[in-house]
Each structure stands twice: as structure tokens, then as C-alpha cells.
Amino acid sequence: MLTGEIPIKIGQMPAKTSPKPRKVKADDPGSLVDWLKAQDDDSLRDLLVHRPDLVHPVPADMAKLAARAATNSSITRVLDRLDAWVVGVAEVIACLDEPFTKKELSALLKEDPELDRALEVLKARGVIWGSDKGMRAVPVLKEVVAPHPAGFGPCFIEERPDLEAVATKERIKQILDKAPKGVDEVISKVLWGPPVLVVDKLNREATTSSAKTPYEYLMAQGVLIATGRHELTLPREVAFVLRGENLLPEDLSKVPEISIKNQRDPQAVDKAAGGAGLHFVQMMEELLDIWGENPPAVLRNGGLAQRDLTLASRICDEDENIAALLAETALAAGLLAADETADPLWLPTPAFDLWRTRTVQERWATLAEAWLTSTRVPSLVGKNEQVRINALSSEVDKPLAPEIKSLLLKALVSLPLGAEPNEDELVAHVKWQRPRREAELIDLLVRSFTHEANLIGARGLGALATTGRALGEMRYTMPSPEARTAAARAAVADPKGHVIKTDPLLVEAIAPLLPDAIDHFMLQADLTAVIPGPPESHVAAELRLLGYQESRGAAQVYRFSESSLKRALERGKDKDEIMEFFKKYSSTDIPQPLEYLLNDLVRQLGSVKITEDPIDDTEPAPGEKRSTVKLRPRPAPEGSPPDAPLLFSAIKALRLSENPKAKVPEVAKSPEPMSPEKLVPFLSEAIEQNQSTTISYAEGDGTIKARFVDPIRVQGGLLTSFDHLELRIRDFALSRINAASITKAKKNGK
């Protein structure tokens, strides 16, 4: 049987879909609403996790949930996240009359054992429902997979009744046996889709005897239908017969294998990854330090000028692609942002100051998490031939990026330790996972992210390291991009009280691969300082101010010169402070040449006494503009799953909507008065402990009412919770809550 690839396209579907009469009587599974009502809480929870758009906002009842689940946009999102086999089965289902049975569908797919998995996935996501003896699909499925579901063309049986005689195994065999040379090649072009051919020279009046080309012969025999002056279409009725026992390509249900290009020593892989991770952290700190002193301007399109990117690459002694990766990762981690002045600049945020105080392992984990969930694609920088794409611009955003990284890591985790994969097969594997996505974009993303994983320390020597496996395994439990952005915003608002959280699994994974940070160095007579390992952050920052870094890596070298020491003195350092730093952290004596150089510079510049500034250090200096660092909004990856409290409350609201006569639980006692500074921690703890609370709330008309609620989240001055009185999820302004307490309700009012 001829084989090929299934094209996935979206468009309008013809009303008549099934080319064959029904042979099996199926049970009617009823409506989607009835099916949803019959599902248990675990099934509903799975549905909402896989389709987060259904709970934003939470529907009022099951009918509204079913209506939203059957919309074009929602079903499109579902199919866009399914693999080629499940998508193919869904498209075949769209070609069948309803209700259909599992037995009927299985017969069309050569009894493929993977059919059970496909049906289970489609049911779990609400695309189809029912039992093996009778199933239906959401009506909009036909529209979403149009115009060529599973590569099929439209049905022509009503327009061309003669097709009934053509679309049989016997007749098709006769036609092909007598066919001229080239017919097989023509059929192979349309059999698996798209089913339309464009032919330059076509005699639409040709008969079997007068046909001069394979196209005209097939048209004359009714195998192809002329649908335009130069257009031929393979009817669905004929395609069903030509494909035989399997309406989908033979190997579509098999996950593409990834061969091993090279087998590396896992310890060598981890060592290389650890070195890359350390280097990435060091480059990030150095770049943001320099941008803190000389911030680049923000372009009108919100990006970074090419000259600034080039300068950044020189600073890091790396190519521009790595400089773009550093800048984009800093933005994603909330360490870099544009300020709000009239002439905005790219500046490190207060979160950067907090980040640099953490251990090198924690700093790496922060960057790795940000990279994994970032929608930024640094490899796009400079790629457009018409208009140059700048780093940090909106053109670098691709919402698909986090999903592809997750799939990529999942594929790499499945390989043996130390395995370097064949990159082309890796690309094909990810494309199979997301066949409806743009193939060219997936190719770019997979190859780019594979390279970036080497640079950030997730891979080493071309193979996945321990760090990369940790990234792959925690992809579903890590903080969402929204949560990390909120954390960075909180750091901007309250840099002293905020703590940036990192995933302990990542810290644990990178820790054995990095040497311990050290707080000493060796001063040399040649005016250099040698650090035999990764330095503590504050030591490295001071050395960068006093000297110029000559080498990076496990051991670093800083060179002091007249210009570097003069720079430090002009920025407020005095001789005694510099000498004290050298004495405290140098494991060797201070060389005389270094001391002489410092003394000469002090005499040249004059004596300057450095004292405490009596002015509040939070106020800008006279004539200095205060700039506010603003975190630019970033698009979150599609379909961030709802958190557990929201899922719990959403299901509760849907259940209670089906029983409107249910009694509101009685509150055991009145809420206790609570000050504003204690309210947020109290509610946060209630959310963490999954506890119901009673709040005293000032309504819009001024009345004070006690509300029995299940808190979900506290964000943006609002408490989102399930309100037992109104049986829905709603927001309460924190400023209107004057009392709160943990509630133990009397069940059923007893």
C-alpha cells in the first residue's frame, strides 16, 4: 500500500463526511453535558489540567463548561498539543458518521494496538465521549481539522453518483492494472494528502482512450475529479479504497526513534556541564555588572541596539549569540528590565542584587529555571533578512518555546546516560509530538535549544547531564513564568524583605558538579590576583571594580593597572579601604609594586575623605533623575496548568451548580479582627494548608457581611476564593477585609 505523511491543515470542512454506509449500529452516548456530569472528580481534574482555558474564568455550571469545551479555539488548542498518532485518529473520527464504535474505528486502522491510548487521550481532553459501543466527537472537530482531515478530500458521491461504482476494490484494481506509466506516482502525491493536484496542461474532456497523461487517465476513470481549470482532487470515497485496511500511514502510531551518535562517559559529561554552568553564571554577573555602570539604551521597539549587543559579546569574550542568550535569560529571570524614564535604559533590577548574594549553585538554578520556561528565542536575533531582529525585542518571543524545550528534555531523558543523540532524528521526534505546529519553527527551536542547553550547563559533550535530567524531571512542578515574574516584581518593590526561590532539585543536581566558592585570592608581583576556584560573589564584584578580568573558568585572573585603580578611587573607594580588602582576602602579602602604584594614584588625585552620606540613601542625589525599573510583561507559554486550590474550587463550584438547593455551611464563630499586615500571611498560610476561612467583608453598599470562603490565591491586592454563599469563585479586595479566621463549618447545617 502506498504510504506518506499526513498534512495537518485547518479550514472549512464539507458537510458530508462519511463515504461509506454504516455497517454497525452504535449506542447513543448522549450529550457532552451529560457525560461531564457523570465524570468523577479525578476525571474532571484531569480535563481542567489538560485544558486550562476552561477555568479562566471558572464556568458557572456544567452546561457552560461543555459549551466552552466545544468551541473552535479550545479544541484547536487541544489538538495542537497532541502527537501525530492521536491527531490522526481524531481526524479519522471527523470523517465518520456518529455515533461510532471502537470496533468500527479499529477496523479502519488495521486493529492498531495504540488505538486505546488515542481514545483515552481524546476522552480525557473532552474531544470525544461515550463508551466503546457508542462515541461522539464535539461537532466543531470537523471544522478544526478541515479542509483535509487525515489528508482526505471531500466526498463527491452526491455530485458524482458514478463514484459508487468506481470506489470498490475490484474496480480500482482494474483501473490500476490497465493504467499507463506514471499513474502510481500521481496517486502517491495525493493519497495521504493534500488530495489536490495542480496540473498546467489538462484536457478536462479527455476520455480513457484519448488521455495523454496519467492525470487525464485517472480523471477519465473517475479516480480524480476536476475541481478547477487546472485542479484535480482525489475523492474521499476513492481514497478510502486506495488506503485499504489502514486509513493512516503504517508507522504513524510509532514514536520516531532517536539513534545514538556517540556514547560519552557520564562523568565527563557532568564535568563539562558543570564547567559550562559555572561559566554561564560568571558571564551573567559580569555583563549585568557592566550594564549597571553603563546601561544600554532601550530601542523604540523595546529591544537592544546591535552595537550594544556587539559590545556585550566583547565584554564576555564570546560571540553575539551567547551575548543574546545572556541578555534574554536575564530578562526572563527578572534580573534585567527597562526603566521608566523618558529615555529608557536596560538596567539590572534589585532582584539581581539579591541573586548575586546566593550561592553559585542557587544562582545557576535561577538561570536554568528561567531558561526552561522562557518564551524568548535568542537564536532569532539578527535572523530576519528584511528587518533585523534585535535582542530583547518582541520579535524574539515565541510562546511555543517552553513546550518545545519540555519535549526536547523529555526525549533526551529517555536516552541512556552519556548518549549524544542524532540531531536530525531528535528534530523528527519532536515534530511527531506536535504535528500541527509549524515544522520549520520546530526545527529551528530544537536545534537552537539543544545548543543553548550546552551553554547553560544542562548538557556536556553533546549529551544530557545530571543537571539537564533534573530540568526535564521538574518541568511540571517548577514555578510558572507568571509566578517567577511576580517574584521578581516583589523583589523590585521590596528588595530587603524578598527572597528569590529556586528549585532545590536543580540546586542539588548542580552542586556536585561545581567546586565550592572561595573567598580568597593570591596577589602576584606582576599586578595580578589569581583565584584558584569560583570566587564568592562579593569578592568577584570587588575585584572587577579594582581590576580587569583576564581569564575565566575554574581559576580566574584579574589584572590591576593605573586605569583600573583610578576608576575605583573615582567611584568612592579610598586607599585604606582597598588595602584592607587586599589584606583580608589575599592569602599572600601585598606586593610592593601594587602598593606603590596605589600610593602614586592617591597623590595624583588628592586626598579625599569618604564619609557616610547624611542624606537618606534612598533619595536621589541633587540633579539626579530617579529611575524606576519596570519588568516588561512577557507572554506566558500557552496553557499553564491551573494550581491545585483553583482546580479544587472549580470542581466544587461545578458540582454545587448542579445542586442549587444545597445548604450553605453554617459558620461556627465570627471572624476575628485582623490588621492589614497580618492578613496576607494569614491567608497565604490558609491556602497552603488548604483551610476554609471566614472573612468579614465590606460590600460595595457599605454593609459588612461574613463570608465563608475557600482561599485560592492572594495576588494584586485581591483574594481569589470560592464563595460558599454565591457558589462561585470570586475576587475580594484585601482592603475591604477587616477580619478573618480559620473556619470549621457544621456539615449539612447540623
Language-model features and meaning:
Residues 709-715, 721, 727-729:
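Low-complexity, glycine/alanine/valine/leucine- and proline-rich hydrophobic stretches
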Residues 2, 6-437, 597:
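Short, amphipathic alpha-helical interface elements at domain boundaries
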